[in-house]
Amino acid sequence: MKIKVKLPDGKEKEYDRGITPAEIAKELGVKKAIGAVVNGELWDLKRPIENDCELRLVTLEDPEAPEFYRHTMAHILAQAVMRIYGKENVKLGIGPTIENGFYYDFDIKNGKLTEEDLPKIEQEMKKIIKENLPIERKEISKEEARKLFNNQPYKLELIEEIEGDRVTIYRQGEFVDLCRGPHLPSTGVVKHFKLLSVSGAYWRGSEKNPMLTRVYGTAFAKKEDLDNYLKFLEEAQRRDHRKLGPHLELFMLNTEYAPGMPFFLPKGVVVLNELMRFSRELHRERGYQEIFTPLIMNEQLWKISGHWDHYAENMYFIEKDEERYAVKPMNCPGHILVYKSRTVSYRDLPLRFFEFGRVHRYERSGVLHGLMRVRSFTQDDAHIFCTPDQIEEEILGVLDLINTIYGQFGFTYRVELSTMPEDHMGDEAIWEKATTALKNALERAGLSYKVNEGEGAFYGPKIDFHIRDSIGREWQCATIQLDFMMPEKFNVTYIGPDNKEHRAVMIHRAIYGSLERFFGILIEHFAGAFPTWLAPIQVAVIPISEKHNDGAEKIAKRISQEGFRVFFDNRRETLGYRIRQAQTQKIPYMIILGDKELESGKISVRTRTGKEIKDVDLEHFVETLRNEVLSRKLELLMEG
C-alpha cells in the first residue's frame, strides 16, 4: 500500500506504507538528519510512517533538535545511574526535557546521590555516548509493560494512567524506559553535555508522595554553545536573588513557619515603597482611582465568581460563627463590588480602579522559589470598566503605561496576543470586536506582536508581556485581559444614553504583576546594584578616623535633610573594611572625609564601582544627587 508524503518544498512523493524518515533522508541525500516532524509531531528517524503526511527532516541545526538530543541525554543519565548504583537499587521516576536542559528523578535504595557524585556519573555517560548504542522504539501491550517494569513502582503507576491498551518503550543497550519520545537514532550523536545540580523533588509534585532525587543537566549540539551557556549560568548564579536578597538585607524566608510567604526587611521595604510610589504617581496622572479591598470575604462571593468551583484547591479558607470565608486569591471580585456599590451612567465611564492588593494562593512546596513563586504576594491590580466602544482607547492607555514603567528600568519586551479558544463563552461577534480592538491598539502603539490563535482564556482575549533582563532572560509580567465572564456573573451594568441597562466591559490588567516577583527580577536584573532612586541606602558617609566624626556627621545630616537615605558609618572598623562593606552592600555613593576634606570644605566621592571624584563641592553633589533621584536615572550621574 502506498502513502503520500508532502515535503517542505511543496512536492508530494509516494512511498510504501511503513517507510521511515531515515529512508526518506537517505533518498533525499540529507545525511545529517536526526529526526523528523510528521504532521506537526516530533518523530524518530527510524519510526515507520503509516499514513499520508507532511514531513520535514530535522538536523542538529533545527529548533526542534534540542527536544531530541536532550531527551536522549536524560535516558543516558538514567542508564549511567543504574550502572553505577545497580539496576536493582534504582527506581526510576520521570526524565523530561525542560527549557535549556533536562532532568531525571531517582529513588536510590541504600544510597545517596549528591553533587559530589556528578563527575563519576558524567564519566559513565561519556562511556555510553562512546558506545554509540542504537536506540530502538517499540510499542508493547500494557501487560508486557507491567512484566518489563515489575520492579519499577513509579513506572507501573504511569502505565496504569496511560489511555489505551498499548504503551511505548525505548531501549538502548541494557537500558529500557517507558517513554513517548522522541529520541536520537543512537547514543553517540550528541557529545556535549553537563550535569548541573541535584535537588529533592516529590514524586508527582505532591508532599504526600516519596521524595526523589532529581538530577539536572544540559546538552548542546556544539561545544561552544555549551560553554557559553555554562558562563551564562555562572552569571545567573551571581545574580540569584535568593542569595543577594538576604546578603543585602532585603528580605528573608522562613520555611518552618511561613513557607512561600516572604518577610521584607527594612531595606527591602524601602525598595517596595519606591516601586509603589512610582506606580502610584503614574496611575494618578492617568485617571486611576486607588482603592483597598478586604483580604477575607464570604464564600458566597467566590461561588458567584466561579473561584469556588474552579480554584478552591488553590485557596485558603476560614470558618467562623458557622460562616465560611476565603482569603482572596484575586482582587477582581472585590473591585466589582466597589463598582456595583452605586448606579453607574455611561457618562461615568471609563472607571479605572487600582489596588496594591495582597492575595494568597496555595502552591505546592516543591515549586516554591524565592520571590518568584510564592503563596502570599501583592498585585498591582487594576480593573477598567468601560463600554465596548472604549476598549481600544483604554487598551492604548494601558500599553503606554506599561511602556513607561518598563522603560524606567531599562527593560525591553515582546508581546503576545492570545485569541478566542474553541471552548469560549460569550458571543463570537463580541470576541471579534474585542480582539480587533486589541490588535488596533497594539498597532497604533507601534508594537509588533505574536498571535497565539485559540489560546486566550475562555472568558476573553488577552495580551501578555515578556520582559528581557540584562542577561537576556525573559520573564512574563504584565497582562491585559478582557473578561466577558465576570460582568455576566455579577451583572455588571451601566445606564446608557437610552436610559436602559447595558453590560459593561471589564479589563483586568497588572504591570508589575506580583510585586514580590518583580522585586526578585529587579534584584537579578541589576545584580543588587539598584539605581540610586531605588537604593535602600543612597549615600554612605565615612569618616577616616574618630577625630573626623563630628564634621562627617554634619555632612551626613545635611544630605539627609534633603530627603536622601544616608548611612553615617562611624563604626570602629578600619577605613578599608567600611569602604569594602559599602561596596558589597551596593551603596551608590560613598563620601570619604578626613583632614583635607573637612578643612577645604570639599568632599571626596567614591562610587560603588570604585571611581573616585575628588574636590567636589558638597552643594554640587547634593544637586547632582537630587537630579539623579528625581529623574529616576538608571546610571550614576557622578560617574558621567
Curated annotation (Swiss-Prot):
Q: What class of enzyme is it?
A: ligase
> The organism sits in which domain of life?
Bacteria
Q: Per the annotation, how and in what number is the cofactor bound? A: Binds 1 zinc ion per subunit.
Reported EC number(s) for this entry are 6.1.1.3
| Cofactor(s) in the UniProt record | Zn(2+)
Q: Could you name the Gene Ontology cellular component terms for this entry?
A: cytoplasm
Quote the record's binding site residues for Zn(2+): C332, H383, H508
* Principal location: cytoplasm
Q: Which InterPro entries match?
A: aa-tRNA-synt_IIb (IPR002314), aa-tRNA-synth_II (IPR006195), aa-tRNA-synth_II/BPL/LPL (IPR045864), Anticodon-bd (IPR004154), Anticodon-bd_dom_sf (IPR036621), Beta-grasp_dom_sf (IPR012675), TGS (IPR004095), TGS-like (IPR012676)
Report if keyword Nucleus is assigned: no
- GO MF annotation list: ATP binding; metal ion binding; threonine-tRNA ligase activity; tRNA binding
Q: Where in the cell is it found?
A: Cytoplasm
Similarity-based family: Belongs to the class-II aminoacyl-tRNA synthetase family.
Q: What does this protein do?
A: Catalyzes the attachment of threonine to tRNA(Thr) in a two-step reaction: L-threonine is first activated by ATP to form Thr-AMP and then transferred to the acceptor end of tRNA(Thr). Also edits incorrectly charged L-seryl-tRNA(Thr).
According to the record's subunit comment, the protein's assembly and interactions are: Homodimer.
Q: What is this protein called?
A: Threonine--tRNA ligase
Q: What is the lineage of its organism?
A: Bacteria, Thermotogati, Thermotogota, Thermotogae, Thermotogales
Q: Which gene encodes it?
A: thrS
